[in-house]
Amino acid sequence: PAKQVDSARTGEIGLVAMPALDQVWAFLKTHDTLRRDGGHNVFLYHHPDNRDDPMQIDFGVEVAQPFTAQDGIECIETPAGEAARTLYVGPYSQMHPAHQAIHSWCRENSRRIGGMSWEVYGDWTEDEFKLETEIFYLLAT
């Protein structure tokens, strides 16, 4: 996804996400060849070693092809490798149990979470109970 990098504590993500995504979308509007039909917003979380530290987050949008960084926007990829995944349907504010379910699955299956996770936000709908978000956690090898 194209991205605008920012760092935040978990409770502050909403405050920094929208301004960052606005910059990415403005960039994509002037670079039509990068736009992908159905390109969704993606949040890529870089988990700090110390849970009390701010988390680096890449806020981005799925694009049609790689590109060279320009205008403060970089092209990154979600990590390669095995990942635990779930599909959450409902209000963004109530997504936490879906994350907890992945953590529980990892414990029950003796799997360790790697250093990154990401969320892919589905198509917008006014009915927040129909919002779809795919949640991925990179698994440690």
Model-identified regions with their sequence ranges:
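A solvent-exposed interaction/effector surface
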Residues: 1-141
